C-alpha cells in the first residue's frame, strides 16, 4: 500500500495506546509526537470519565474511546487495529513509553508493512510493536484469552513464527519507564500471571496455534476492577 501523504510529507497512519490511571504519562507520550500522524487512537480503560485529552498539533484525527470497564491491554490494541482497518501499519505503544526525537519519522521511513516491526526500547520490544498489515493478515490479532496482560506477547510471537511472518528491527528509539513496581499492580498481577502462564503452557502442550478469544468467565476471573 502506498504511504499516506500530506503535501510531500508521509504520515504515520495510526498511533494507538491504552491508558488506565496515569494520564500524566499518557500526556507525556502524546507530547512526544514530533511527526505527522493521521489517526491517534486512545482506548481509556479507566472507566472514570475524568480525562479529556487534547489533540496534538501534528495529529489529524484524535479518537478517545472510553469504556465502562477495562478491555485489558491487548483487547484495547485489537480494538485500535479493528477500528482503523485500512491502515498499512499500526504503531502501538504502552502509555508509560514515549517517542525519542525523530523516532516516528524513522519508523515511517523503515517500516515493513508485511512484517512485525520492533524498535529499540528499554525492557521489552513488546512495549511498542509495529504491526504491518501483512502480519495481521497472516497471523491475526492478539488472543484476548490472555486477560488483562502478560503471556499475550509470548503467544503472539509463537503464532507469527508459525505463520512465517518476518520480524524486522528498526533503528528508531522509544523510551520506556515501566510502572510494574507499583504495589497494587504486583498484587493483582500475582494472581492473573499464573492463570495466563498456565493457559499459554497448555497451548504449547497441545500444539495449539488458534485464537481462543475473549471469554466472559476469564474476564470475570481475572478482573482487576
Language-model features and meaning:
Residues 133-150, 159-170:
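Aromatic-glycine-rich donor-binding/catalytic loop that engages nucleotide-sugar donors
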Residues 87-98:
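Short beta-strand-to-loop acidic/aromatic patch adjacent to the donor-nucleotide binding site
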Residues 102-120:
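Conserved donor-nucleotide/metal-binding helix-loop-beta segment in metal-dependent transferases, i.e.
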Residues 21-35:
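Short, well-formed alpha-helical segments that are part of the catalytic scaffolds
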Residues 67-84:
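Glycine-rich, basic loop-to-helix element that forms the pyrophosphate-binding segment
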Residues 34-66:
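Acidic donor-binding segment of Leloir-type glycosyltransferases
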Amino acid at each position: 500500500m502506498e504511504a499516506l501523504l500530506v503535501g510531500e510529507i508521509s504520515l504515520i497512519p495510526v498511533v494507538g495506546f491504552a491508558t488506565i490511571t496515569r494520564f500524566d504519562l499518557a500526556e507525556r507520550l502524546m507530547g512526544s509526537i514530533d511527526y505527522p500522524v493521521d489517526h491517534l487512537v486512545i482506548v481509556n480503560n479507566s472507566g472514570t470519565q475524568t480525562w479529556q485529552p487534547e489533540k496534538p498539533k501534528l495529529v489529524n484525527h484524535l479518537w478517545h474511546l472510553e469504556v465502562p470497564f477495562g478491555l485489558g491491554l491487548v483487547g484495547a490494541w485489537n480494538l485500535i487495529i479493528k477500528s482503523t482497518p485500512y491502515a498499512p501499519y499500526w504503531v502501538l505503544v504502552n502509555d508509560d513509553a514515549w517517542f525519542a526525537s525523530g523516532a516516528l519519522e524513522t519508523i515511517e521511513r523503515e517500516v515493513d508493512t508485511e512484517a512485525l516491526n520492533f524498535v529499540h526500547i528499554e525492557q521489552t520490544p513488546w512495549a511498542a510493536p509495529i504491526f504491518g498489515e501483512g502480519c495481521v493478515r497472516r497471523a491475526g490479532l492478539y488472543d484476548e484469552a490472555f486477560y488483562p496482560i502478560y503471556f499475550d506477547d509470548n503467544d503472539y510471537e509463537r503464532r507469527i513464527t508459525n505463520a512465517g511472518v518476518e520480524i524486522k528491527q528498526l533503528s528508531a528509539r522509544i523510551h520506556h519507564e515501566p510502572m510494574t513496581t507499583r504495589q497494587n499492580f504486583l498484587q493483582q498481577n500475582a494472581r492473573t500471571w499464573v492463570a495466563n502462564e498456565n493457559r499459554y503452557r497448555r497451548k504449547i502442550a497441545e500444539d495449539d496455534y488458534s485464537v481462543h478469544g475473549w471469554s466472559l468467565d476469564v474476564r470475570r476471573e481475572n478482573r482487576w476492577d
